[in-house]
């Protein structure tokens, strides 16, 4: 087995600055060793070389006196710590621009992208297409690093101040796009939504990563390749980060979402490193986020079956935020003491959630509501659904946000495997396969439903609404004919002044469609987006009632836990089971403070549990066995508690 498939890393990335080229490696490693760390990521080449490069298109750090990369590899390997070398080919020192302007990004206005003393390169240019591989070759032939990582890989159009500079118009891009589709590059704002250009970018990035893979593996097949992409890599990297200008709502499940999307899509083939970025933002690299947020992100990493990854800027010696480092060490210690249990989980989930694209709010809303509703589920990312549609088989239910993008082969595999299909955001006629499966025809789309409602008067289908008959609707609503349905549309009426607030009429339109054979259902509005944006429990309850009505076997465990308790339940290779409870209290929507112990939590599991073994001295839960079910009653929950279950 390749070393990265062991899925047990506790990695620290010191994002090296030029001035760190002269750091005290022994003092640095003492910090690494005290952090239970078994892998480091350090700067090697690209923008700055942290070793004595002989290549004219690299720039050595002016503070480099010896060979920092060589020293780090020597010290780390002497103590059994792996080293992943970091490269950033997105920029070079600007001195090279005058000699080779063809390597660099060019805006629509014909301008290069400068930032401080660097200039942005283009992924289509010779520097990234050919010379980057020569830089990798120089490192791999001279240093026994365990892996390589590429930062800011692909088509980069924003600078560090988050300013958008637009599509690259360099000669290499223009030629490559013309060869790809016979057209000129899209201009203005059109490039952001142009599907042909998006496919072109994916092909360019994927082809380059595959060429890099062939070159790297020819030198040393044991070197792991890692970046923010799935193509040609051994380790997919993502980040749980923060940004001061990022719109609310704050997505607390970031680490779980990143890890679950990789595990469900590429498990057994690739592993994931989801980096808990300590910095508040790129602008504020020297203050960390709340230490409690760092703990949540790292605990979610390991609870979701992934590895640990933490990043700070520069060396520990002059890093001014020791609180975040202490939080990291707490979680790394838990993982290190129980390493044999982590990274080898076997999913018990009966629900599969399709991810149409990263960051899609309809999808994120469904991720949120399933987590909040304590439904166990896996995630299948769109590229994996295209390459491996068979991975959708074997579930009780497949949930499909953005039905128009869903691959037909994935839907077919899910149905043939016995899954019921639940579509969400079916608001127009573009999702032809979903319409066929539902047996409906699209009539029209209501673009503005502000002040409209959905009726939950049918309490047999919507038992979660004993005292509430209307639930708010907003944004688009699809009108269809030919299907059975529920959730009648209550049309908008007057909403002001109070004396005129009447006149609502219930129409024939339905918010929940269902096929005649009972194998498919669809929300004719963006339910996930409403939950993502507004957070009303009503939309979560609509979703869970509909899912329970469609596929009751999708619900494995029962619990009275509040939404602030994230539940993970998996199988272990030896036949035992692993239950993890993450207390997310202390989060008020923006601020993350220490958690409040959550009392009186009970979980009912659909199996006979014969023994419970708490980790890290957690209190023993009360066990009530009853045939094929077991009820566990827990002492007040701390931030993270885990239990090995004999079954």
What do the PLM-derived regions correspond to, one by one?
Residues 1-50, 54-86, 222, 344-348, ...:
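Mature N-terminal, pre-catalytic/accessory segment of carbohydrate-active enzymes
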Residues 1-15, 106-120, 267-282:
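N-terminal small/glycine-rich loop or linker at the start of catalytic domains
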Residues 11, 32, 76, 132, ...:
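Conserved, mostly hydrophobic/aromatic
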Residues 28-68, 91-110, 114-116, 157-169, ...:
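Aromatic-lined carbohydrate-binding/catalytic grooves of carbohydrate-active enzymes
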Residues 37, 144-145, 153, 221:
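Proline-aspartate-enriched helix->loop->beta-strand connector
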Residues 85, 89-143, 173-202, 207-211:
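Active-site-adjacent "subsite" loops/lids of carbohydrate-active enzymes
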């Amino acid at each position: 087995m390749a070393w990265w498939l062991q899925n047990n890393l506790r990695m620290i990335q010191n994002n090296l600055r030029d001035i760190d080229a002269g750091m005290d490696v022994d003092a640095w490693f003492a910090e690494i060793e005290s952090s239970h760390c078994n892998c480091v990521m350090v700067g090697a080449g690209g923008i700055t070389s942290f070793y004595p490069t002989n290549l004219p298109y690299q720039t050595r750090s002016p503070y480099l006196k010896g060979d920092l990369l060589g020293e780090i590899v020597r010290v780390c390997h002497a103590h059994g710590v792996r080293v992943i070398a970091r490269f950033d080919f997105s920029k070079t020192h600007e001195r090279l621009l005058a000699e080779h302007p063809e390597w660099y990004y060019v805006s629509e206005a014909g301008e290069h992208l400068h930032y401080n003393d660097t200039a942005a390169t283009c992924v289509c240019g010779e520097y990234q297409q050919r010379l980057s591989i020569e830089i990798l070759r120089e490192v791999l032939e001279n240093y026994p690093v365990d892996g390589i990582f590429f930062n800011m890989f692909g088509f980069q159009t924003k600078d560090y101040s988050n300013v958008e500079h637009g599509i690259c118009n360099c000669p290499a891009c223009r030629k490559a796009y013309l060869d790809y589709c016979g057209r000129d590059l899209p201009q203005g704002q059109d490039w952001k939504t142009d599907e042909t250009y998006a496919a072109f970018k994916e092909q360019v990035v994927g082809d380059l990563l595959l060429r890099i893979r062939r070159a790297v593996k020819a030198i040393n097949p044991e070197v792991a390749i890692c970046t923010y992409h799935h193509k040609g890599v051994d380790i997919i990297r993502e980040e749980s980060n923060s940004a001061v200008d990022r719109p609310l709502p704050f997505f607390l499940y970031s680490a779980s979402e990143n890890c679950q999307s990789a595990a469900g899509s590429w498990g057994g083939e690739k592993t994931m490193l989801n980096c808990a970025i300590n910095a508040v933002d790129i602008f504020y690299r020297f203050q960390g986020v709340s230490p409690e947020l760092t703990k949540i992100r790292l605990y979610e990493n390991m609870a979701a079956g992934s590895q640990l990854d933490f990043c700070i800027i520069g060396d520990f010696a002059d890093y001014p935020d020791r609180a975040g480092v202490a939080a990291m060490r707490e979680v790394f210690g838990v993982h290190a003491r129980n390493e044999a249990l982590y990274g080898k989980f076997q999913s018990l989930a009966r629900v599969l959630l399709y991810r149409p694209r990263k960051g899609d709010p309809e999808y994120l809303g469904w991720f949120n509501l399933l987590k909040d509703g304590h439904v166990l589920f896996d995630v299948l990312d769109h590229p994996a659904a295209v390459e491996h549609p068979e991975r959708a088989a074997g579930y009780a239910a497949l949930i499909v946000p953005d039905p128009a993008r869903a691959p037909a082969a994935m839907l077919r595999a899910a149905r043939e495997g016995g899954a019921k299909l639940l579509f969400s955001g079916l608001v127009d006629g573009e999702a032809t396969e979903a319409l066929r499966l539902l047996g409906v025809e699209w009539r029209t789309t209501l673009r503005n439903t502000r002040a409209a409602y959905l009726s939950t008067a049918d309490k047999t289908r919507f038992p979660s609404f004993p005292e509430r008959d209307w639930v708010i609707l907003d944004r688009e609503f699809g009108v269809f004919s030919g299907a059975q349905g529920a959730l009648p549309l209550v049309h908008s009426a007057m909403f002001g002044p109070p004396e005129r607030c009447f006149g609502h009429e219930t129409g024939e339109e339905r918010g929940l469609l269902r096929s005649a054979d009972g194998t498919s259902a669809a929300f004719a509005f963006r339910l996930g987006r409403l939950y993502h944006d507004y957070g009303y429990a009503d939309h979560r309850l609509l979703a869970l009632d509909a899912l329970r009505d469609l596929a009751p076997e999708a619900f494995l465990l029962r619990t009275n836990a509040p939404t602030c308790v994230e539940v993970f339940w998996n199988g272990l290779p030896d036949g035992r089971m692993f239950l993890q409870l993450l207390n997310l209290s202390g989060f008020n929507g923006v601020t993350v403070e220490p958690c409040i112990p959550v009392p009186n939590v009970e979980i009912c599991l659909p199996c006979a549990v014969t023994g419970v073994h708490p980790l890290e001295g957690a209190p023993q839960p009360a066990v009530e066995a009853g045939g094929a079910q077991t009820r566990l009653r827990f002492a007040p929950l701390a931030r993270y508690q885990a239990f090995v279950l004999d079954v």
